[in-house]
Amino acid sequence: MHVVILGSAAGGGVPQWNCRCSICSLAWAGDSRVRPRTQSSIAVSPDGERWLLLNASPDIRQQIQANPQMHPREGLRHSPIHAVLLTNGDVDHVAGLLTLREGQPFSLYATPGILASVSDNRVFDVMAAEVVKRQTIALNETFEPVPGLSVTLFSVPGKVPLWLEDASMEIGAETETTVGTMIEAGGKRLAYIPGCAGVTEDLKARIAGADALLFDGTVLEDDDMIRAGVGTKTGWRMGHIQMNGETGSIASLADVEIGRRVFVHINNTNPVLIEDSSERASVEARGWTVAHDGLTLDL
């Protein structure tokens, strides 16, 4: 199984377009300690030829250009991207669908709840139904979006997308609007969970034994954005678990047998983005890799 992390940042990327927090300031200055990062997306293939795109970032054209595996190679119109799978309806995971509208056939997979957030917005009708086949997938159903690649979706604690929030919103609910994925090929297993509000016993059981885990790395501490002075929301309010602390992802997953552990979907205010920081060193010392754009895994 071949895995390419196309975009490793959370919504807005690094640096964010209007941000001069301490981390974005380093990125704007071209400081080598903070790599620029695009918004959350990965691609997975069983053979290096046919690819499944997981989440369609607003930066998808830039990501395709930066990764030769994604380039068109045959005739006048071609793409090695055969299918797209959405793990939620967040803007940073669906806006890139509008870029993939140039008459290129592919299948779009999501749970009924996630797919409804796309289908109910007419702007996405630029993806003609006869060209882009929308496929509804139930939780715990195993399917093959690309031949040789088996995928199972499962609910994880989360919330509805920001643009669908209302008074009835429940943070941490396990529904079909935020899902994790288990991907299998060639006897190897990859768990991809870019958004998660908490680690449950069921989640730990599902990912146990995976050869690699790509997990929500939005915030180091729950109050990262508040400490940075650029926002008032906590990680929890945004539907994301913190890395640190007794209930954080590092401690909660420490006893789960997993191969490689990689943080993705990293917010611009997370200090682990600074490569020589004590925060980065602490995370790495506990067995985790901080993803960057273009990072590849061959399982």
From Swiss-Prot:
Keywords: PQQ biosynthesis, Transport. InterPro entries: Metallo-B-lactamas, PQQ_synth_PqqB, RibonucZ/Hydroxyglut_hydro. Pfam families: Lactamase_B_2. GO terms for biological process: pyrroloquinoline quinone biosynthetic process. Pathway: Cofactor biosynthesis; pyrroloquinoline quinone biosynthesis. SUPFAM superfamilies: Metallo-hydrolase/oxidoreductase. Belongs to the PqqB family. May be involved in the transport of PQQ or its precursor to the periplasm. This is Coenzyme PQQ synthesis protein B. It comes from Methylorubrum extorquens (strain CM4 / NCIMB 13688) (Methylobacterium extorquens). The gene is pqqB.
